[in-house]
């Protein structure tokens, strides 16, 4: 909407990224677990500093037309993921507008399949359960068309703590009480 357009125009905002995040079930080569899947837009992919934290493989969410994902080091270790392997991971999520069928459980679950292109390491909390993938794949998995669960902003280079407080105050005022505006430490 208009409020979000005005946020993009705020002189302190350097990057504006749409995200869609949800916990999903992951199956990779016989290993299963729960992960926090974060769908990101192409702006995130182009400007992310995550590329500097890749420990294996590369930071790439697309190989030609094929979607790929990057995985936190702790999760990759637990699931035996390696970008050098040909195995793909399957991400599962219950279909939102359908009752769960005991007779045919597969009909109640959406699935997306993709290979890990890279493993990243930022900190243990993030590394243990995060998968980053294209927002289009996340929308397909969750049954959404254009919805997002959040907007991540990065301030322009050289911004101070005072600039951060000012930006949070301005953005909160712009969006109103129905939205939470948090810095990365308060999330």
Regions found by a protein language model. Name each.
Residues 20, 38-40, 56-135:
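Hydrophobic secondary-structure segments that place a key small or acidic residue at a functional site
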Residues 44-48:
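Short helix-loop capping/hinge motifs at secondary-structure junctions, enriched
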Residues 1-36, 42, 53-65:
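Hydrophobic, regular-secondary-structure patches
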């Amino acid at each position: 909407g208009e409020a979000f357009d005005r946020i993009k125009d705020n002189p302190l905002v350097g990057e504006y990224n749409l995200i869609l995040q949800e916990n999903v079930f992951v199956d990779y080569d016989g290993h299963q677990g729960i992960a926090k899947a974060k769908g990101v837009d192409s702006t995130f992919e182009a400007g992310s500093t995550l590329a500097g934290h890749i420990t294996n493989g590369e930071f790439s969410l697309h190989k030609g037309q094929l979607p790929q994902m990057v995985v936190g080091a702790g999760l990759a270790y637990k699931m035996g993921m390696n970008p050098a392997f040909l195995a793909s991971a399957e991400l599962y999520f219950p279909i939102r507008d359908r009752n769960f069928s005991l007779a045919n459980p597969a009909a109640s679950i959406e699935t997306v399949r993709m290979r890990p292109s890279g493993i990243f390491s930022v900190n243990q909390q993030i590394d243990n359960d995060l998968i980053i993938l294209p927002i289009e794949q996340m929308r397909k998995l969750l049954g959404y068309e254009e919805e997002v669960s959040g907007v991540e902003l990065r301030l322009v280079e050289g911004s101070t703590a005072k600039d951060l407080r000012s930006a949070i105050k301005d953005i909160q005022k712009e969006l109103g009480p129905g939205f939470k505006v948090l810095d990365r430490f308060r999330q």
